[in-house]
Amino acid sequence: MILLVDIGNSRIKWARLDGGKPADMGAVTRGKTGIKRVLSKAWKEFGDVNRVVVANVGGPKVAEQLEQWLQTHWQIAPEFLTARSNGYGIRNAYSKPETLGIDRWLGLVAVRQRYRGGDRKKAICIVDCGTAITLDVLAADGKHLGGLIIPGLAMMPKFLADHTAGINETTEAVEYSLLASTTSAAINAGALYGAVAFIDRVSHDVAVEMKGELKFVITGGDAPRILPLLRDKYEHLPDLVLRGLARVAKDTSKVRRETDLDCAAQ
């Protein structure tokens, strides 16, 4: 079995590769003290895993913990992916392509794979609403035009608590309203409407530049909160990064099989 793993800043998502697509998806919140205990509980029923293909934006410490866990339990090493200058019909906008977040690169890979035929005549705006909110644009010819990053809904209140006197991080239930009557609700609503305004304005400006030929895709844990307030019609793809992982894992599986056959023939 090939296991696809998407490690974010707050959650870990996974799926098995089935016919080139992600299947049997699961997710857990990352533990504050590490991920080994979380993985032992979440993956205890998995058997016959021979490859683990990983998109990690959670940092080197969590990567090291995953390596240790996989070696201890399954005696295999993870395959950490990085963004490329080009591939899968995409040309990376970054002069140092490997510095583009792997989650953003795989989002580009996934939408390029998903939209074919007539849909390929339009550019695609991809919004990922996670710990950070990212917006990337992929031209119809596969050229990545670049993107933007702002703090996500959970990060904005933390920033205010860290840098503003009189505002503390709250443990109250998250509340959203147009005009709030408590400080915590005002912060949460401000974060939400700020994110919506950012996405709407940037997507509008990009659409003008593209002369209206633009499709919209949204993903990430906070997408369900943001999506209802957006002006444009977005396709919600919660498993976008896993779709990109599946595409790359399928491609590299073919290369590995061909290499094994070549070695066997020698």
Curated annotation (Swiss-Prot):
Binding, ATP: 6-13, 131
InterPro entries associated with the record: ATPase_NBD, Type_III_PanK
Annotated positions binding K(+): 128
Alphabetized UniProt keyword annotations: ATP-binding, Coenzyme A biosynthesis, Cytoplasm, Kinase, Metal-binding, Nucleotide-binding, Potassium, Transferase
GO biological process: coenzyme A biosynthetic process
Assembly and interaction partners: Homodimer.
Name of the protein described by the UniProt record: Type III pantothenate kinase
Species assigned in the record: Nitrosococcus oceani (strain ATCC 19707 / BCRC 17464 / JCM 30415 / NCIMB 11848 / C-107)
The gene coding this protein: coaX
